[in-house]
Swiss-Prot record:
Matching InterPro entries: MEDAG/TEX26
UniProt subcellular location: Cytoplasm
Full protein name: Mesenteric estrogen-dependent adipogenesis protein
Classification lineage: Eukaryota, Metazoa, Chordata, Craniata, Vertebrata
Gene name for this UniProt entry: MEDAG
Function: Involved in processes that promote adipocyte differentiation, lipid accumulation, and glucose uptake in mature adipocytes.
GO biological process: positive regulation of fat cell differentiation
Length: 303
């Protein structure tokens, strides 16, 4: 199904969608998106900054993070235009959880912002040169959010009181996006996983690897690459709307996305692509989760 939705002929792009049509799109109409990393850095200077040999991403405690942004998944480094940069702050693609509070914080954290993964591609024209793309996962789109939430809910219901490992994989949908002849070099990096270790005396299924699950996330990929100044401005507003802060609700059930719910969460999905005019509303409370977030100021307890 993912291959059919992401076939080159049907792939939504800025060459097939006019500027006016793109302005009328709801943010929730964008399930997944791809654009050159360099273009993303230029369009989102508040969310990403190149400082020397570092690609700086605002940490949860920094004011810029409270204004929105992305959950960047990586291994600490990213290559751009042949140069290797260190990530100053990012989320690890694999974490271990040992209690319900950690699980709850992790779940809320990964769903609080759009996800970003780095994609390295060898083109058909020049197989020796890699291009770096940013792959965006809109966790506020009902289709994407449903796949993540249902994956987490289903594995819990099947392994009550036992340890388990759950992985979310985007390799197939990304590889199907690019035309034949282009090679995704780092497909294994297009995933994230967590392992919940329960305090069970006999964890046979976990010991033998029978409680490992993988959810292959599928969706329609929007091509946000463009050289047109007008369309670049539209893309900028589009990205800002996608990454606006998500307001925390009073209970978990209230925070779950519903197309019929009313209130601030649905403001993210209106047709107005202008940036939020006021930041005086309560913003999502960032979660101090040291085993998830990597930064140069925070020691990594898993290395």
């Amino acid at each position: 199904m993912a291959g059919l939705e992401s076939a080159p002929a049907a792939r939504p792009s800025l060459t097939s969608i006019s500027s006016g049509e793109l302005r009328s799109l709801w943010t929730c109409d964008c399930e997944l998106a791809l654009l050159p990393l360099g273009q993303l850095l230029r369009l989102q200077p508040g969310a990403f900054q190149l400082r020397g040999d570092q690609l700086v991403v605002p940490a949860p405690a920094e004011p810029a993070s409270a204004r929105g942004g992305f959950n960047v998944f990586g291994d600490g480094f990213v290559r751009l235009d042949g140069q290797l940069y260190r990530l100053s702050s990012y989320m690890r693609r694999y974490v271990e959880l040992t209690n319900y509070c950690d699980y709850k914080d992790y779940r809320e954290t990964i769903l609080s912002k759009p996800m970003l993964f780095f994609v390295h591609v060898q083109t058909k024209k020049d197989s020796l040169k890699e291009r770096t793309y940013a792959f965006l996962v809109n966790t506020r789109h009902p289709k994407i959010r449903r796949q993540i939430e249902q994956g987490m809910d289903m594995v819990i219901s099947s392994v009550i009181g036992e340890s388990y490992r759950l992985q979310f994989d985007f390799q197939e949908v990304v590889k199907n996006f690019f035309p034949p002849g282009n090679k995704v070099v780092n497909g294994e990096d297009l995933s994230f996983a967590y392992e919940f270790k329960a305090d069970a005396l006999f964890d046979f299924f976990y010991w033998f690897g029978l409680s490992n699950s993988t959810v292959k996330v599928n969706g329609k990929v929007l091509n946000l690459s463009s050289t047109s100044p007008e369309k670049k401005e539209t893309i900028k507003l589009f990205l800002e709307k996608m990454s606006e802060p998500l307001i925390r609700r009073s209970s978990f059930s209230d925070r779950k996305f519903s197309v019929t719910s009313r209130g601030s969460i649905d403001e993210v999905f209106n047709c107005n692509l202008s940036p939020r005019s006021s930041l005086m509303e309560p913003l999502v409370a960032e979660l101090p989760f040291p085993c998830v977030l990597e930064s140069e100021e925070t020691p990594n307890p898993f290395i």
